[in-house]
């Protein structure tokens, strides 16, 4: 699965998925010659991407100016020769950045002219859609959308914040630009896209794919409510189930970001405006100025770890407890075995066979960085969880057919370009359609 950050780098994404030669041509000048290990890992990951049969996308645009009005999902599905389904999560309706029903002006006439050009939206091309997709080499059946419980009202809450900003004080144009760039005015909410695929090797002849995107602007407790509602919807399914997506497991009520990232997702020519607006946000000129207090950013690599208030506060743990203890009506469970023998490099512990681990915690799938202080926090936000034919989430000696094996978090591939492909790397897992040798079933740890 891959959170593609709206498809801002669609050419690189497409090349990574379909054309290694083109990808290397696009990125070769960005890779330091001395970093041979990084390059070798990226090459291995690039090769692995060429063999995918199923792809889940989060944050895929359709008809947005920031992504040249492309249909990101259709573009990638065509390049991959895959079937696809797309579910709309949000309709973007910001009056300045999306609809052009309001204006913002800068005192410098040349900057203002360029800003108006960059903000202008072609109404004939604009659809304003943002969502989640499933792409598959297998035919898709019974496609449906399940709307998750609302944990954050994006339109009402953001509109109220904008109103208080603009009505409560007198703002300079630069200050107003900064405050508005941090807001996302849109209709809609988090959802899961669900589809069945035809798989002859499955006893039911099918597998069920669930592409989910949980809320970032809420507490971990509300994310657990969203997961609980989703699993209740899936409870009667007798097929193998692949549940994947951005669960936004930050441990807090928001995802860390930067002014740079916010400008990237709002204005097409973001590189120019990042350079121009550095001094507007910080007198020292840091392009990646944090929008959150410094104490918020800490290494948060294992949301499955034990929760010990004060000593080790892990408010995401209840969500994973619920996933582990969940039973489908057919008695099956999600696979939490974490078997060392089917991971590369060998790692054992919770979910190690479906989500790549490192020496401590999981390999992060989202990193927040500042130019003046390096990486501030690393987070494991994106997940793949699989229901194979297990009746106990931890017991080792159970079938490996349809069970997750050899997970990869493709950090090296994602960082091959100097400015990375997406703010999330792709993550993959192998699912064997036939039973694996008995010797691979052993060895699991909590």
Enumerate the predicted regions with their spans.
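Active-site flanking residues adjacent to catalytic metal/cofactor-binding acidic residues
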Residues: 2, 58, 212, 244-247
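Metal-dependent phosphoester/phosphodiester hydrolase catalytic core
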Residues: 143-190, 195-228, 253, 445
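Metal-dependent phosphoester-hydrolase catalytic domains
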Residues: 140-145, 220-221, 228, 234-242, ...
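Active-site environment of divalent metal-dependent phosphoester hydrolases
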Residues: 7-8, 62-65, 92-95, 153, ...
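Charged helix-capping and loop-helix junction motifs
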Residues: 69-72, 224-230
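Conserved hydrophobic/aromatic beta-strand scaffold that supports enzyme active sites
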Residues: 132-134, 192-196, 211, 382-384, ...
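N-terminal, active-site-proximal structural segment of metallo-dependent hydrolase catalytic domains
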Residues: 1-132, 148, 158, 162-183, ...
């Amino acid at each position: 699965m891959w959170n593609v950050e709206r498809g801002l780098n669609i050419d690189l994404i497409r090349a990574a998925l379909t054309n290694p030669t083109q990808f290397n041509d696009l990125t070769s000048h960005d890779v330091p010659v001395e970093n041979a290990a990084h390059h070798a890992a990226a090459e291995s990951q690039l090769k692995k991407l060429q063999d995918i049969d199923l792809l889940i996308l989060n944050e895929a645009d359709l008809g947005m100016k920031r992504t040249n009005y492309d249909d990101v999902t259709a573009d990638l599905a065509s390049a991959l020769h895959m079937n696809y389904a797309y579910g709309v999560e949000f309709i973007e309706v910001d009056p300045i950045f999306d609809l052009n029903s309001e204006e913002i002006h800068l005192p410098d006439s040349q900057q203002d002219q360029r800003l108006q050009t960059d903000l202008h939206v072609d109404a004939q091309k604009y659809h304003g859609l943002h969502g989640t997709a499933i792409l598959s080499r297998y035919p898709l059946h019974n496609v449906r959308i399940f709307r998750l419980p609302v944990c954050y009202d994006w339109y009402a809450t953001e509109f109220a914040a904008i109103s208080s900003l603009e009505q409560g004080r007198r703002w300079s144009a630069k200050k107003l630009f900064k405050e508005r760039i941090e807001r996302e005015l849109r209709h809609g909410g988090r959802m899961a896209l669900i589809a069945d695929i035809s798989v002859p090797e499955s006893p039911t002849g099918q597998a069920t794919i669930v592409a989910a995107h949980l809320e970032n602007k809420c507490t971990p407790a509300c994310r657990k409510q969203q997961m609980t509602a989703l699993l209740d919807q899936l409870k009667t399914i007798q097929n193998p189930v692949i549940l994947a997506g951005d669960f936004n497991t930050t441990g807090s009520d928001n995802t860390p970001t930067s002014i740079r990232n916010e400008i990237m997702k709002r204005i097409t020519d973001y590189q120019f405006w990042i350079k121009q607006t550095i001094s507007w946000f910080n007198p020292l000129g840091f392009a990646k100025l944090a929008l959150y207090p410094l104490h918020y950013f800490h290494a948060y690599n294992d949301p499955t770890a034990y929760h010990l208030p004060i000593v080790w506060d892990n408010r995401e743990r209840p969500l994973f407890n619920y996933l582990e203890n969940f039973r489908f009506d057919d008695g099956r469970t999600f696979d939490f075995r974490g078997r060392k023998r089917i991971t590369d490099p060998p790692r054992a512990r919770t979910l190690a066979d479906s989500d790549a681990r490192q020496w401590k915690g999981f390999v992060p799938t989202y990193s927040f960085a500042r130019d003046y202080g390096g990486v501030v926090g690393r987070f494991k936000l994106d997940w793949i969880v699989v229901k194979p034919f297990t009746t106990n989430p931890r017991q080792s000696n159970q079938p490996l057919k349809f069970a997750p094996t050899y997970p990869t978090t493709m950090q090296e591939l994602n960082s091959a370009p100097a400015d990375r492909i997406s703010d999330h790397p792709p993550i993959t897992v192998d699912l064997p359609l036939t039973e694996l040798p008995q010797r691979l079933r052993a060895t699991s740890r909590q």
